[in-house]
Structure formats: C-alpha cells, structure tokens
C-alpha cells in the first residue's frame, strides 16, 4: 500500500502548480490533435493542438452522480478553462453489466445543470474497443501479456500478499502464438465467461500488488448498451483508462487518491504501447487528489439507485 501521508501536507493548489510547471517547460507546445481521438498516426496527421491542456471528467454510466462527483467535475472543467484548455466528458463504459443509456443522459443533465459545457467533446470508451483489442494483441505479440486459464480463485490465491510474493501462472511462459490464438478465440466467443483472462506480464514479486500481472481483458457474454452484441470480451478499467486518456490527448489525468497505487500500471501500459508504436509523446500523466467525504450525505451510487428505485 502507498503511504498517503505526504498528500496531507501538499498545498491545495498542487495540481495547478504542476500544470503551470508543465506549461513553462513547453511540454505540450508541439502536441498535435487529429480533430478527434485516435492513435499516434492519426494525431501525427493533425495540427498543433490549440488546447493548451486537456482534462476529462470520466464517469462510469452505472448509476446517478452524487455531490462527491461535483468536486471532480469542477476541478477538471475549471482547470481546463483557466489554462485555455478543453475538458472532455467521457463515459467509461467498459463493463456492460450495469451500464445504461439512462445513466448517460442523467450524467449529461447533471454536468449541464452545474453550468459546464463539454463543447462537443463527448466520448465513450466503447468507441475505442477496436483499438483496445489491437493494443492487447500488440502486448501479447511483444511478450508483455498472455492468456491465463487459471480460475479466478487460483489467480487470487497465487497473487500473494503484501508480505509475500505471488506465483507465476503455469500458462505464463507458453509461446506467443499460443496466446494470440487463444485471444482470438476469446474474441470469437469460443470460450465461456470466467474460463480465461488476458494478463499483463510484469512481475509477480512486485511489492505493488497491482503490478503482479493484472488482468487486462475478460470474457463477458453480455449485451452492451452501446455496442450491442458486437463484443463478448471487454477491457478491464485499469487497462482501458490510460488508453482512453492517450487517444484523447489528455495531458493531466486527474483522479482520486484511491488510484494512486494504480499509477505505476497506468504508466506501464502507456510506455509499452509507445514502444509498440501505437501511442506517442506527450503521454498523459495521472495526478491524484483527496476525495470528498461528507457526513450525513449519500456518497454511494448503489445507495442512490436504491433511493431512486424505491421512490424516496
């Protein structure tokens, strides 16, 4: 686990200070924007981005927003405004189980009600599924990912603990062609839910458990609210998130402290895909802030859904 104590003494405007420093260093002066999200080749054909920075508010459309989300909304939109940038409204719809168009509409209404305009920059993670599939294949091809046929319980048991290393999967070192074939079979719907997952190949002895070969793709034979039955495999959020940021040319990926331990994996994904020529610099950087906690206030999507459904 990370020690968050250093965050408590960090100035409240530390993200603003980071942005000012990045701009003074001219980190984004040659950053190109292809007019829409895309890979390295797409943006290379574009012009220099007129947006000095790009941020995003990335809710998952699996419930109603609560007051806790307002902090992230204000932070991302106001920072973009103050630094002559753009804030994207992105729906992280990578898990089809509980996501619906009703929540998409509700979230858009809430953001508008707060007075913010995403100016045509509304994006959906599901629009990037084709790229994410190719990205996962690229990682397998370069020896940085594999298909694991262990059960979920076996994977959990072999992950290790905070004080003991994990164990390599028996499938980890099978040849690349074997894993590519299995992944294509997963895509074609030839395997059942839970029978296998694609995992990043990093380090099962890492002191950061999030780097012990995390899953990046799983099988879910569920209809997606946007893509229908086109896909039966879906990317894990922690794999999809950095890719979405990079495709959208986000410069500052601002999230709550709970994702601090995930930052090394966020960077790992981007660096590997840059090595494979799918992404290019400047890559987005993740920055964390403390989440909003209030007493006597509902700060849970699940609880809000219960209140709405039961007409409270």
Q: In which residue ranges do the predicted regions lie?
A:
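Active-site-proximal, well-structured secondary-structure segments within enzyme catalytic domains
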Residues: 48-51, 134, 158
């Amino acid at each position: 686990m990370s020690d968050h104590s250093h965050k408590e003494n960090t100035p409240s405007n530390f993200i603003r200070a980071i942005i000012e420093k990045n701009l003074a260093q001219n980190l984004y002066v040659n950053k190109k924007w292809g007019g829409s999200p895309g890979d390295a080749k797409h943006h290379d054909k574009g012009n220099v981005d007129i947006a000095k920075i790009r941020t995003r508010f990335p809710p998952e459309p699996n419930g109603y927003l609560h007051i806790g989300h307002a902090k992230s909304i204000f932070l991302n939109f106001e920072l973009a405004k103050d630094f002559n940038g753009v804030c994207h409204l992105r729906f992280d719809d990578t898990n089809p189980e509980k996501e619906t168009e009703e929540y998409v509409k509700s979230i858009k209404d809430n953001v508008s009600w707060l007075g913010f305009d995403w100016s045509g920059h509304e994006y959906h993670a599901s629009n990037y599924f084709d790229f994410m599939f190719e990205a996962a294949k690229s990682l397998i091809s370069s020896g940085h990912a594999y298909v694991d046929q262990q059960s979920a319980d076996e994977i959990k048991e072999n992950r290790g603990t905070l004080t003991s290393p994990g164990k390599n999967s028996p499938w980890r070192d099978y040849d690349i062609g074997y894993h590519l074939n299995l992944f294509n079979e997963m895509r074609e719907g030839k395997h059942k839910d839970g029978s296998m997952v694609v995992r990043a190949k990093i380090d099962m002895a890492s002191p950061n458990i999030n780097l012990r070969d995390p899953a990046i793709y799983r099988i879910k034979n569920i209809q997606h609210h946007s893509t229908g039955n086109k896909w039966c495999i879906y990317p894990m959020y922690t794999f999809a998130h950095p890719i979405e940021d990079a495709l959208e040319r986000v410069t500052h990926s601002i999230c709550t402290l709970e994702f601090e331990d995930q930052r090394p994996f966020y960077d790992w994904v981007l660096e590997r895909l840059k090595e494979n020529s799918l992404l290019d610099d400047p890559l987005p950087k993740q920055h964390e802030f403390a989440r909003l906690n209030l007493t006597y206030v509902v700060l849970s999507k699940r609880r809000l859904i219960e209140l709405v459904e039961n007409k409270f």
